[in-house]
């Protein structure tokens, strides 16, 4: 490991919570370089341009085995010390089991679950005492949600995976935290909340004001 190079990796960094995490980690100066990961390279470049910390736009689809392999190869070649991993990549879509396509369901599971696990396993060998893993789950992790059944199940997976991982990391000084927000002011919230499914979710989770 090259201890002189501290890297923070943020997935989903092109928008929403991922972009905000990039801004906050930049402000806190927790790394020598930020790796901003998402599919939209132009959006990543725009985010990187807002930051003072040197930032790298890593255009990658986290459901692609080839793209995950490329990230692993870059980590192996550069051997940095990963101080933060923020897994904010993910998506949700309202609809019941009849209206959401099989492809959308599979993509949701692949990104929200497998992509998150793959990134965590890729980064862990480069972490040491003081490093942090932050997994973006959701308040949906705590209750079955009609019209978001698969999404809620994926976030429950993230919560339980992170809790178990935290126990496995006991004594290493590496921490793993699952973030479980309700509504957050993002592009997804603007579209989803006014929908019929959004009203059902609000009834179950509570109609909090988006933060």
Q: PLM features: residue spans?
A:
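Conserved glycine-rich cofactor-binding loop
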Residues: 14-15
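SDR active-site lid
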Residues: 166-211
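Conserved NAD(P)H cofactor-binding loop of Rossmann-fold oxidoreductase domains
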Residues: 88-93
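Substrate-binding pocket helix/loop in short-chain dehydrogenase/reductase
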Residues: 96-109
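Residue(s) in the substrate-gating loop at a strand-loop-helix junction
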Residues: 138
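Active-site helix of classical SDR
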Residues: 120, 154
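Conserved glycine-rich Rossmann-like NAD(P)H-binding loop of the short-chain dehydrogenase/reductase
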Residues: 26, 30-46
């Amino acid at each position: 490991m090259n201890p002189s190079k501290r890297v923070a990796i943020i997935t989903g960094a092109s928008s929403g919570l991922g972009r905000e995490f990039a801004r906050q980690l930049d402000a806190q100066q927790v790394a020598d370089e930020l790796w901003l990961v998402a599919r939209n390279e132009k959006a990543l470049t725009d985010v990187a341009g807002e930051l003072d910390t040197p930032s790298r736009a890593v255009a990658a689809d986290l459901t692609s085995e080839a793209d995950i392999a490329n990230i692993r190869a870059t980590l192996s070649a550069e051997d940095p010390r990963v101080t933060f991993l923020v897994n904010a990549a993910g998506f949700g879509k309202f609809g019941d089991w009849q209206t959401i396509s099989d492809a959308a369901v599979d993509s949701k599971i692949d990104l929200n679950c497998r992509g998150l696990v793959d990134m965590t396993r890729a980064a862990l060998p480069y972490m040491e005492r003081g490093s942090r893993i932050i997994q973006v789950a959701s308040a949906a992790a705590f209750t079955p949600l009609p019209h978001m059944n698969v999404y809620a199940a994926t976030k429950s997976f993230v919560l339980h995976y992170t809790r178990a991982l935290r126990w496995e990391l006991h004594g290493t000084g590496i921490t793993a935290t699952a973030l479980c927000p309700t509504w957050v002011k993002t592009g997804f919230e603007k579209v989803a909340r006014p929908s019929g499914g959004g009203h059902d979710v609000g009834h179950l989770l509570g109609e909090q004001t988006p933060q």
